[in-house]
């Protein structure tokens, strides 16, 4: 079970980290189908999810299943690179 399945508030940071790695670093940690599922789940729970970076995530991007065009903070970039180092 993925961490965002246990804690819906983790959908935002994982969406942002996966998007940064994929669109900015050409690194894919999960399959496209799993990313699409993450986007769909986040879209369904969007109104109830709380996270400091929620403002970076639009319902339009989630509907399209993309994180292209996001302006990533240094915290997101750093966290994504740490995730890459530890991902199994």
What function would you assign to each model-found segment?
Residues 1-88:
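Phosphate/adenylate-binding "loop-and-lid" substructures adjacent to NTP/NAD/dNTP-binding pockets
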